[in-house]
């Protein structure tokens, strides 16, 4: 479910050494399954352990996960990285905003999962996003751009060289193309 690197495990052991006996760490997702999902790690004293928590055992400590966060922390990883700028704990949870879908799920659900877990996080760096409007009977994914992508001068390149290529590679034989139906209105919101 959650992988924790050796360096992160050592970091947690060091932090927990200064806490009361029996304190664990808690890994959680606030607003799981939504675009506002936020992941975090905190101390979990013994009296904060719930009966339905999932307990994960690591070397020198245990990690507690509340029942509603479990599915959204599938394939999550925690690392502790040190570089010239200092040290940083990173938590990556690709399924926090949307549950991972099975390979035999309907095409619309699988496309939506890729959009939410892979494409929109990339577009977010420019303040943008896309939404799947529909998949036509002839296999065209109809998309609508929002945020900084609406009116962006590079939207055609993003669509054809990025999004379409990625989706066609992932859904070969099921998807035949993508089409943008956004009424692009360049403005202060547009990424330039």
Curated annotation (Swiss-Prot):
The keyword Glycosyltransferase does not apply. This is Fe/S biogenesis protein NfuA. Its cofactor is [4Fe-4S] cluster. Homodimer. It comes from Shewanella denitrificans (strain OS217 / ATCC BAA-1090 / DSM 15013). It comes from the Bacteria. Binds 1 [4Fe-4S] cluster per subunit. The cluster is presumably bound at the interface of two monomers. Belongs to the NfuA family. Disulfide bonds: none annotated.
């Amino acid at each position: 479910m959650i992988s924790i690197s050796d360096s992160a495990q050592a970091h947690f052991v060091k932090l927990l050494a200064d806490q009361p006996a029996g304190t664990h760490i808690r890994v959680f997702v606030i607003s799981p399954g939504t675009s506002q999902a936020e992941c975090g790690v905190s101390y979990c004293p013994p009296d904060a352990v719930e009966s339905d928590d999932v307990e994960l055992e690591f070397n020198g400590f245990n990690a507690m996960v509340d029942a509603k966060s479990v599915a959204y922390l599938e394939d999550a990883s925690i690392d502790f990285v040190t570089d010239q700028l200092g040290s940083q704990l990173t938590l990556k949870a690709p399924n926090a905003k949307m549950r991972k879908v099975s390979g035999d799920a309907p095409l619309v659900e699988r496309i939506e999962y890729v959009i939410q877990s892979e494409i929109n996080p990339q577009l977010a760096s420019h303040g943008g996003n896309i939404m799947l409007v529909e998949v036509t009977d002839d296999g065209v994914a109809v998309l609508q751009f929002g945020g900084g992508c609406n009116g962006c001068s590079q939207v055609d390149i993003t669509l054809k060289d990025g999004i379409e290529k990625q989706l066609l590679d992932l859904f070969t034989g099921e998807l035949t193309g993508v089409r943008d139906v956004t009424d692009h209105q360049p403005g202060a919101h547009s990424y330039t």
